[in-house]
Amino acid sequence: MVEQKRYALFLATLDSEFVKKTYGGYHNVFVTTFGDEGEHWDSFRVVSGEFPDEKDLEKYDGFVISGSSHDAFENDDWILKLCDIVKKIDEMKKKILGICFGHQIIARVRGGTVGRAKKGPELKLGDITIVKDAITPGSYFGNEIPDSIAIIKCHQDEVLVLPETAKVLAYSKNYEVEMYSIEDHLFCIQGHPEYNKEILFEIVDRVLALGYVKQEFADAAKATMENRGADRKLWETICKNFLKGRVPTN
């Protein structure tokens, strides 16, 4: 009998009413994107202080850290505890996929610097350029490494200084670190491979209603997805290959 794979999702965000009504919560959004049949996924609402017991970390095959409206450089109790847990998982060489806030938290834990994005916030669909020389053919990217990948972006912070052992895997016009890896067990993405058009548009409408952005900014964000979408299938494949140690056949 094949042993069931177990994964833990660290949710650093609360569910919006839209996400709860449409998808049943962010747990379902992530598991639909990264999960496979027969796996067991546990969610821990770390933003609310919910964490696994340290003695239980060993039972998981991999971890995913979500995005957040909080800053990864803050020193709130839950953020400091998350950093401590991530450090322990890193020492165990367990796989961690860091997304947006998670990407920044891992950089912080490993000695990098995170701060406000120098070129300002992003809320849109954008392309990131792949550093092909940094990616080994046959790794979780497969043998056919693309020049660029489209991804939905939603952030106001960035990794300003990478940890010494990190390797940049992608960059963009405004951001030097769109994606990086550390050794074989840490893989981090500034964008949101789990987001779709509906989630982006709801976030745009919400921040506009709250007065965080102007109408022109909101219109420009939605315009980026008028005629195309994110490369979600490719992101799904890459992230699954990483988390599950798969060797692609393409």
UniProtKB/Swiss-Prot annotation:
Practical and industrial applications: Cancer prevention by GLSs is attributed to the formation of isothiocyanates (Scheme 1a) upon hydrolysis.
Domain of life: Eukaryota
Residue ranges annotated for the Glutamine amidotransferase type-1 domain, each copy included: 16-213
Functional note: Involved in glucosinolate biosynthesis. Hydrolyzes the gamma-glutamyl peptide bond of several glutathione (GSH) conjugates to produce Cys-Gly conjugates related to glucosinolates. The gamma-Glu-Cys-Gly-GSH conjugates are the sulfur-donating molecule in glucosinolate biosynthesis. Converts phenylacetohydroximoyl-GSH to benzylglucosinolate. Can use the GSH conjugate of the camalexin intermediate IAN (GS-IAN) as substrate. Required for the biosynthesis of camalexin, a pathogen-inducible phytoalexin with antibacterial and antifungal properties.
Reactions mediated catalytically: an S-[(1E)-1-(hydroxyimino)-omega-(methylsulfanyl)alkyl]-L-glutathione + H2O = an S-[(1E)-1-(hydroxyimino)-omega-(methylsulfanyl)alkyl]-L-cysteinylglycine + L-glutamate; (E)-1-(glutathione-S-yl)-2-(1H-indol-3-yl)acetohydroximate + H2O = (E)-1-(glycyl-L-cystein-S-yl)-2-(1H-indol-3-yl)acetohydroximate + L-glutamate; 2-(glutathion-S-yl)-2-(1H-indol-3-yl)acetonitrile + H2O = 2-(glycyl-L-cystein-S-yl)-2-(1H-indol-3-yl)acetonitrile + L-glutamate; (Z)-1-(glutathione-S-yl)-2-phenylacetohydroximate + H2O = (Z)-1-(glycyl-L-cystein-S-yl)-2-phenylacetohydroximate + L-glutamate
GO CC annotation: cytosol; plasma membrane; secretory vesicle
Localization (cell): Cytoplasm, Cytosol
Active site annotation, chain numbering: 100, 192, 194
EC number in record: 3.4.19.16
UniProt lineage: Eukaryota, Viridiplantae, Streptophyta, Embryophyta, Tracheophyta
GO annotation (BP), single: proteolysis
InterPro entries membership: ChyE-like, Class_I_gatase-like, GATASE
Database matches in Gene3D superfamilies: 3.40.50.880
Species for this entry: Arabidopsis thaliana (Mouse-ear cress)
Principal location class: cytoplasm
Enzyme class, spelled out: hydrolase
Keywords: Cytoplasm, Hydrolase, Protease
The protein's name in its UniProt record: Gamma-glutamyl peptidase 1
Cytoplasm in keyword set: yes
Pathways per UniProt: Secondary metabolite biosynthesis
UniProt GO molecular function: gamma-glutamyl-peptidase activity; peptidase activity
Similarity remark: Belongs to the peptidase C26 family.
